[in-house]
Amino acid sequence: MKRKNMTKFDKAVSAAFTGHRFYNFSQQEVIRERLTKAILEAYEHGISNFISGFAIGIDLMAAQIVQSLKPSCPGMTLTAAIPFRGQADRFKPGDRMVYDGLMASADEVIILSEYYYTLYFLDRDEFMVENASLLIAFYDGRERGGTYYTFKKANCLGIPVVNIY
Protein backbone atom coordinates (compact mmCIF):
# COMPACT_ATOMS: atom_id res chain seq x y z
CA MET A 1 0.00 0.00 0.00
CA LYS A 2 1.32 3.43 -0.91
CA ARG A 3 1.19 6.11 1.74
CA LYS A 4 1.63 9.74 0.82
CA ASN A 5 0.75 13.01 2.44
CA MET A 6 -0.51 14.58 -0.78
CA THR A 7 -0.91 13.39 -4.33
CA LYS A 8 -2.63 14.35 -7.52
CA PHE A 9 -4.76 11.85 -9.38
CA ASP A 10 -5.71 11.48 -12.97
CA LYS A 11 -8.91 13.39 -12.35
CA ALA A 12 -10.49 12.05 -15.55
CA VAL A 13 -10.62 8.51 -14.13
CA SER A 14 -11.41 9.38 -10.50
CA ALA A 15 -14.71 9.58 -8.61
CA ALA A 16 -15.27 10.63 -5.01
CA PHE A 17 -17.98 9.73 -2.53
CA THR A 18 -19.96 11.90 -0.17
CA GLY A 19 -22.84 10.95 2.07
CA HIS A 20 -24.37 11.20 5.47
CA ARG A 21 -22.83 9.42 8.41
CA PHE A 22 -26.21 8.38 9.69
CA TYR A 23 -29.03 6.99 7.61
CA ASN A 24 -32.09 4.80 8.16
CA PHE A 25 -30.48 1.44 8.95
CA SER A 26 -33.51 -0.41 7.55
CA GLN A 27 -32.56 1.08 4.15
CA GLN A 28 -28.98 -0.24 4.27
CA GLU A 29 -29.43 -2.89 1.57
CA VAL A 30 -31.24 -0.50 -0.77
CA ILE A 31 -28.46 2.05 -0.30
CA ARG A 32 -25.83 -0.64 -0.87
CA GLU A 33 -27.55 -1.70 -4.12
CA ARG A 34 -27.75 1.91 -5.36
CA LEU A 35 -24.10 2.55 -4.50
CA THR A 36 -23.02 -0.66 -6.24
CA LYS A 37 -24.97 0.30 -9.35
CA ALA A 38 -23.48 3.83 -9.40
CA ILE A 39 -19.94 2.49 -8.94
CA LEU A 40 -20.34 -0.08 -11.71
CA GLU A 41 -21.85 2.50 -14.08
CA ALA A 42 -18.96 4.88 -13.37
CA TYR A 43 -16.47 2.06 -13.97
CA GLU A 44 -18.16 1.19 -17.28
CA HIS A 45 -17.72 4.85 -18.31
CA GLY A 46 -13.97 4.88 -17.58
CA ILE A 47 -13.78 5.70 -13.88
CA SER A 48 -11.27 3.37 -12.22
CA ASN A 49 -10.09 5.23 -9.09
CA PHE A 50 -12.59 5.72 -6.27
CA ILE A 51 -11.79 8.17 -3.46
CA SER A 52 -13.41 7.71 -0.05
CA GLY A 53 -13.03 9.84 3.06
CA PHE A 54 -13.43 6.70 5.23
CA ALA A 55 -15.92 8.34 7.60
CA ILE A 56 -18.57 6.22 9.31
CA GLY A 57 -21.64 5.70 7.16
CA ILE A 58 -21.73 6.07 3.39
CA ASP A 59 -17.95 6.54 3.05
CA LEU A 60 -17.10 3.20 4.63
CA MET A 61 -19.96 1.44 2.84
CA ALA A 62 -18.76 2.77 -0.53
CA ALA A 63 -15.17 1.73 0.23
CA GLN A 64 -16.34 -1.79 1.14
CA ILE A 65 -18.25 -2.05 -2.14
CA VAL A 66 -15.25 -0.90 -4.18
CA GLN A 67 -13.04 -3.47 -2.45
CA SER A 68 -15.61 -6.22 -3.11
CA LEU A 69 -15.84 -5.28 -6.82
CA LYS A 70 -12.10 -5.07 -7.49
CA PRO A 71 -11.62 -8.78 -8.31
CA SER A 72 -14.18 -8.55 -11.12
CA CYS A 73 -13.23 -5.03 -12.28
CA PRO A 74 -9.63 -4.95 -13.56
CA GLY A 75 -7.80 -1.74 -12.74
CA MET A 76 -10.31 -0.55 -10.14
CA THR A 77 -8.55 1.15 -7.22
CA LEU A 78 -9.55 2.51 -3.82
CA THR A 79 -7.95 5.65 -2.44
CA ALA A 80 -8.43 6.63 1.19
CA ALA A 81 -8.46 10.40 1.77
CA ILE A 82 -7.93 10.66 5.52
CA PRO A 83 -8.43 14.14 7.01
CA PHE A 84 -5.99 13.63 9.90
CA ARG A 85 -3.99 10.82 11.47
CA GLY A 86 -6.09 9.17 14.17
CA GLN A 87 -9.42 9.78 12.43
CA ALA A 88 -10.79 6.43 13.66
CA ASP A 89 -9.54 6.67 17.25
CA ARG A 90 -13.07 7.38 18.53
CA PHE A 91 -14.93 4.95 16.26
CA LYS A 92 -16.96 2.16 17.85
CA PRO A 93 -15.13 -1.19 17.80
CA GLY A 94 -17.14 -2.59 14.86
CA ASP A 95 -16.63 0.52 12.75
CA ARG A 96 -12.95 0.59 13.70
CA MET A 97 -12.51 -3.00 12.55
CA VAL A 98 -14.07 -2.18 9.15
CA TYR A 99 -11.95 0.98 8.89
CA ASP A 100 -8.69 -0.82 9.74
CA GLY A 101 -9.38 -3.61 7.24
CA LEU A 102 -10.13 -1.13 4.47
CA MET A 103 -7.08 0.97 5.31
CA ALA A 104 -4.88 -2.12 5.08
CA SER A 105 -6.26 -3.03 1.66
CA ALA A 106 -6.59 0.45 0.11
CA ASP A 107 -4.45 1.00 -2.96
CA GLU A 108 -3.41 4.42 -1.73
CA VAL A 109 -3.78 6.22 1.60
CA ILE A 110 -3.47 9.98 1.69
CA ILE A 111 -3.32 11.58 5.12
CA LEU A 112 -4.00 15.28 4.70
CA SER A 113 -2.82 16.32 8.17
CA GLU A 114 -0.84 14.72 10.96
CA TYR A 115 -3.01 16.56 13.49
CA TYR A 116 -6.64 17.32 14.19
CA TYR A 117 -7.74 20.88 13.37
CA THR A 118 -11.09 22.66 13.08
CA LEU A 119 -11.76 22.46 9.33
CA TYR A 120 -10.24 19.03 8.67
CA PHE A 121 -13.40 17.45 7.20
CA LEU A 122 -14.10 20.36 4.85
CA ASP A 123 -10.48 20.34 3.67
CA ARG A 124 -10.73 16.59 3.04
CA ASP A 125 -14.00 17.03 1.13
CA GLU A 126 -12.48 19.80 -0.98
CA PHE A 127 -9.42 17.64 -1.74
CA MET A 128 -11.66 14.81 -2.94
CA VAL A 129 -13.84 17.02 -5.16
CA GLU A 130 -10.84 18.79 -6.68
CA ASN A 131 -9.30 15.44 -7.61
CA ALA A 132 -12.41 13.80 -9.10
CA SER A 133 -14.38 14.10 -12.32
CA LEU A 134 -17.50 12.57 -10.74
CA LEU A 135 -19.14 12.74 -7.32
CA ILE A 136 -21.29 9.84 -6.13
CA ALA A 137 -23.50 11.19 -3.35
CA PHE A 138 -26.06 10.06 -0.83
CA TYR A 139 -27.51 13.51 -0.17
CA ASP A 140 -30.95 14.18 1.31
CA GLY A 141 -31.15 17.90 0.47
CA ARG A 142 -30.35 19.36 3.90
CA GLU A 143 -28.52 22.66 3.47
CA ARG A 144 -25.88 22.12 6.15
CA GLY A 145 -23.00 19.79 6.92
CA GLY A 146 -20.16 18.20 5.01
CA THR A 147 -22.29 16.35 2.48
CA TYR A 148 -24.06 19.60 1.57
CA TYR A 149 -20.71 21.41 1.29
CA THR A 150 -19.24 18.70 -0.95
CA PHE A 151 -22.36 18.47 -3.13
CA LYS A 152 -22.42 22.27 -3.54
CA LYS A 153 -18.66 22.44 -4.25
CA ALA A 154 -18.97 19.81 -7.00
CA ASN A 155 -21.85 21.74 -8.58
CA CYS A 156 -19.86 25.00 -8.46
CA LEU A 157 -16.91 23.30 -10.18
CA GLY A 158 -19.14 21.73 -12.83
CA ILE A 159 -18.40 18.20 -11.65
CA PRO A 160 -21.26 15.79 -12.42
CA VAL A 161 -23.05 14.41 -9.36
CA VAL A 162 -24.88 11.10 -9.18
CA ASN A 163 -27.17 11.34 -6.15
CA ILE A 164 -28.41 7.91 -5.08
CA TYR A 165 -30.63 9.23 -2.27
Which residues are covered by each model-predicted region?
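Acidic/glycine-enriched connector segments
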Residues: K2-Y165
